[in-house]
Amino acid sequence: MTVDSHHHLWDPAQGEYPWMTGRFAPLRREYTAGDLIPELTAHGVRATVVVQVRADVRETEELLALTTRHPFLAGVVGWVDLTSARVDRQLEALRTGYAGQRLVGVRHDVSSEPDPGWLLRADVQRGLAAVAEAGLAFDLEVTPRELAAAAQVAAAHPDLRFVLDHLGKPPVAAGGSALWRRGLAGLAARGNVWCKLSGLVTEADWARWTDAGLAPYLAEAAARFGPDRLLFGSDWPVCTLAASYGQVLAAVRRGLPPQDLDKIFWRNASAAYRLDLGALVAAGTTRSARGGSDD
């Protein structure tokens, strides 16, 4: 069984995606659940976690609504304004709203904030406490420069489950960095942090990456987090800039010990996000997904 813990769905006609320029311009098109389903079917992926892209609660509401039409969407990592004095009310509205039971986490693009210590701000700390109180996870979208602050925040919120996206975005194309390795080690020392094995192909040379070139980063994450705190994520459709869905999945599989794959490819996602996978498996998610609407 496989769970994809990180992918996106979007429609540029419905919101702003200012980063879809230059090399990322090919992504400026609609990507629907219907587009993803053939990939899931071809590769035996039974369930997924769809992750926000826009800093807009409306996108989170739209993603939650999609889960009612596509049962393979086991969870939504959405967005709320962590700096708002009303963040607890925003979370409550989402959790008690339409399909709110599928909200499993919150994410904010910390890497886009000018201040590398943004996570340490008092208002953000209050917001993270509200996320913990709501029983949700928090996805860390950070680069190596923010890893030290992320480790401090994880230590300050031991009851909050943190999930590091894309291994903290190591500069694979440049051959890695000591800053990334130090930061990853510090964050991994916190037992309430999981790490997604995702996004590596787009941190590498898009045209020349190889499994062997990614292997040291997978090995570093495995050494730091161990088999119980690693999750597979495709980062579809962003990954398609450099690789197919199947290539991404295969690269991660080949870079890990076979005895750990069961945990990394579904059990850990269930633990980190508290996914209700039993119901999904019983329903036959992939078959149900093929019968859903193409949106």
Where is each model-derived feature located?
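Active-site environment of divalent metal-dependent phosphoester hydrolases
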Residues: 10-12, 55-58, 83-86, 111-114, ...
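Divalent metal-dependent hydrolysis catalytic cores, especially in the metallo-beta-lactamase
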Residues: 22-29, 34-55, 73-81, 104-111, ...
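Short, electropositive alpha-helical surface patch
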Residues: 58-74, 158-164, 214-223, 245-256
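Catalytic pocket-lining loop regions of alpha/beta-barrel enzymes
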Residues: 118-231
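Active-site gating/metal-coordination segments in enzymes
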Residues: 60-145, 152, 196-200, 208
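Conserved, mostly hydrophobic/aromatic
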Residues: 6, 48, 63, 76, ...
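Mid-to-C-terminal alpha-helical segments outside catalytic/metal-binding sites
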Residues: 1-3, 26-47, 220, 224-231, ...
